[in-house]
Every structure is written in structure tokens, then in C-alpha cells.
């Protein structure tokens, strides 16, 4: 049995082909796994657990089907869906995790998993904005507003963020490898898996010939899905990108 990791699916009513591909992924690929870890930004927008719509209902049913097959599902918040709460998590049968976790495999190997936005430490303005949005009081005030007002506020914030991002350098938008490396050292781990940047890659950092850190970055789902599979028996790690319309053949 294997453990699957995905991130940045960005489900939206505006992208039904991604939704269809994700549902096929859950039905065919995830059903054969031991566990599924969703590392944030499952949804393009999340305004609160009271925002019921057909997309949210269908995704909850599909994830609940994993739970009913005794396949564990875990979720780490992303920067698009950090308001996803316990009510929706229960409907999905998934467990909410804190912003970064250390997994210990049966072999003893440790893997750090996180969404990845906290690694973009060179972007000071984003980190300040993130800290503000994640404050419990700010979140409670926002969630107390009518859904229509929340939607307008979110649209305005997103528009500003899109414009602001256009003028940021690649250095600011990418992760800080030193911070990632320090996190691995502090947790006595040698593998990190994250998303957020939409730049799939495998970074190898050599501390010595025998001591190599691997930082694996998941891609954003669009025409292709992105997945990391960890085989607990032999510690094999497989990074895969696959056409969403061919999941049944995968």
C-alpha cells in the first residue's frame, strides 16, 4: 500500500474538467492507496463551511467514499482554502492537520509535509498579509459576515493580489531553500514535500556524499494532475504528472 500526496488542485465551478479529473483520481487511483494527503489549495476559493454548493457537496461525497473504504484522508490548509473548517472536514471524513507535519514511515524515515507558502520567506509583504489573514479574530469577524459580502471582499483581495504578484521577482515567489533545509535539520528529516509555487521540481541538497536532502515540489492541476506516491515497504518515492482525462488508464 502506498501514501499519496497532492496539492493545488484549485477546484472551481469555472473549471469542470479539473473537477471531473479529480473525481476520477479519487475513484481509481486514491482507492488503491493507504492514505491521501491534500497539501492545501484543494479549492480555488473557500469562503466558509456554510458556502454550500454542488461542487462542495460532490467533492465531500467522493472524499467520504475513501473514508468508508478505510482510506485515511488528511488536509493541510493552503492560502486559498485556509478557512475550510471542521464541519466540512467531517462531511469529507478527512482530518485537518496543522500547517506543517512530520510523518514517520514504518522504516523510521521522516518526511516533512506542508503547503509551502511559509517557505516563501523572501516575500515579506505576503508573509505579513498571511499572518494577518490567519489571525483567529480576523477569521471570526470575516466568517460572521453574510456570504455575499464575504464573496465581494474576497474578490477585491484576490484582484489586488493578482496585480501585486505581477511586479514580484521570481526570487520572492520561490521558496527559500535555506529555510527549508533548516526545517529538515531541526526535524531530523531528509525529505520535504510541498506545493504552492506551481513549479514542480525535485531539489537535491548535498550535505555529504551519503547525506542528501530532497525537497519535492508538487505541481498545480490543470491539463495534468500532479502526485507523489510513497511506498512504505521500500521507501520508493515516485513523482508523477498525468493527463486528467486518462486517469482510468493510469
From Swiss-Prot:
Catalytic reaction list: UDP-2-N,3-O-bis[(3R)-3-hydroxytetradecanoyl]-alpha-D-glucosamine + H2O = 2-N,3-O-bis[(3R)-3-hydroxytetradecanoyl]-alpha-D-glucosaminyl 1-phosphate + UMP + 2 H(+)
Binding-site residues for Mn(2+) 2, renumbered to this chain: 41, 79, 115, 196
Entry keywords, A to Z: Cell inner membrane, Cell membrane, Hydrolase, Lipid A biosynthesis, Lipid biosynthesis, Lipid metabolism, Manganese, Membrane, Metal-binding
Keyword check for Oxidoreductase: no
Topology with respect to the bilayer: Peripheral membrane protein
Pathway annotation from the record: Glycolipid biosynthesis; lipid IV(A) biosynthesis; lipid IV(A) from (3R)-3-hydroxytetradecanoyl-[acyl-carrier-protein] and UDP-N-acetyl-alpha-D-glucosamine: step 4/6
Name of a matching Pfam family: Metallophos
Domain of life: Bacteria
UniProt name for this protein: UDP-2,3-diacylglucosamine hydrolase
Source species: Blochmanniella pennsylvanica (strain BPEN)
Amino acid at each position: 500500500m502506498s501514501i499519496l500526496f497532492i496539492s493545488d488542485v484549485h477546484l472551481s465551478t469555472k473549471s469542470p474538467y479539473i473537477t471531473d479529473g479529480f473525481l476520477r483520481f479519487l475513484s481509481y487511483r486514491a482507492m488503491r492507496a493507504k492514505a491521501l494527503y491534500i497539501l492545501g489549495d484543494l479549492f480555488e476559493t473557500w469562503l466558509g463551511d456554510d458556502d454550500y454548493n454542488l461542487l462542495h457537496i460532490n467533492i465531500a461525497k467522493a472524499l467520504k467514499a475513501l473514508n468508508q473504504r478505510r482510506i485515511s484522508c488528511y488536509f493541510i490548509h493552503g492560502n486559498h482554502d485556509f478557512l475550510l473548517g471542521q464541519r466540512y472536514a467531517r462531511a469529507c471524513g478527512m482530518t485537518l492537520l496543522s500547517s506543517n507535519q512530520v510523518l514517520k514511515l514504518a522504516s523510521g524515515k521522516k518526511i516533512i509535509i506542508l503547503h509551502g507558502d511559509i517557505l516563501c520567506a523572501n516575500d515579506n509583504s505576503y508573509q505579513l498579509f498571511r499572518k494577518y489573514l490567519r489571525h483567529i479574530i480576523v477569521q471570526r469577524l470575516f466568517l460572521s459576515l453574510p456570504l455575499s459580502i464575504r464573496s465581494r471582499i474576497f474578490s477585491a483581495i484576490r484582484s489586488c493580489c493578482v496585480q501585486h504578484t505581477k511586479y514580484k521577482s521570481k526570487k520572492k515567489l520561490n521558496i527559500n531553500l535555506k529555510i527549508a533545509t533548516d526545517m529538515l535539520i531541526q526535524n531530523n528529516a531528509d525529505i520535504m514535500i510541498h506545493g504552492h509555487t506551481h513549479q514542480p521540481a525535485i531539489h537535491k541538497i548535498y550535505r555529504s556524499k551519503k547525506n542528501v536532502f530532497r525537497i519535492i515540489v508538487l505541481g498545480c492541476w490543470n491539463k495534468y494532475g500532479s502526485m507523489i506516491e510513497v511506498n512504505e515497504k521500500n521507501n520508493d518515492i515516485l513523482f508523477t504528472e498525468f493527463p486528467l482525462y486518462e486517469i482510468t488508464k493510469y
